[in-house]
Structures are given as C-alpha cells and as structure tokens.
Amino acid sequence: MLSLDFNNELIKAAPIVGTGVADVSARLFFGLSLNEWFYVAAIAYTVVQIGAKVVDKMIDWKKANKE
C-alpha cells in the first residue's frame, strides 16, 4: 500500500505481501535470503552461459576439422 502525504512531504510504502512470502519461502531453502538467491542465480546463469559457449566452440571446431 502506498500513502502520499503532500502536507508533510512524506511517502509511506508498506511492503508487498508477495515479497514477504517470497522472503520466507527463500529462507526455507538452505537458509539464504532473497537477495542471496539472486547472487546464486546470477552465478549459475554465468556458469551455464560459459558452458554453452564452450560446447558451441567445440562443435564449430569439430565441423572445421571434419572438412
């Protein structure tokens, strides 16, 4: 919920329920917080992309040597 008070120049924002639920459920897996899971996901994504690039280059190298 967002509350704007123009007289006192205040903006009050209550946390979204989904964020709280996501944080609690994230802590159930290995005790990591939500932003730590983002770090894990970013590292895993990077490793997968590097692996995919290596496989792609190996396939290109095999095709070049076959001809």
Swiss-Prot record:
Q: Which residues lie on this side of the membrane: Cytoplasmic?
A: 1-36
Q: State a single Gene Ontology molecular function.
A: pore-forming activity
Gene Ontology biological process terms from the UniProt entry: viral release from host cell by cytolysis
Going by the entry's taxonomy, the superkingdom of the source organism is recorded as Viruses
Task: Give the chief site where it resides.
Answer: host cell
Family designation: Belongs to the T7likevirus holin family.
Functionally, this protein is described as follows:
Accumulates harmlessly in the cytoplasmic membrane until it reaches a critical concentration that triggers the formation of micron-scale pores (holes) causing host cell membrane disruption and endolysin escape into the periplasmic space. Participates in determining the precise timing of host cell lysis. Participates with the endolysin and spanin proteins in the sequential events which lead to the programmed host cell lysis releasing the mature viral particles from the host cell.
Write the protein's name.
Answer: Holin
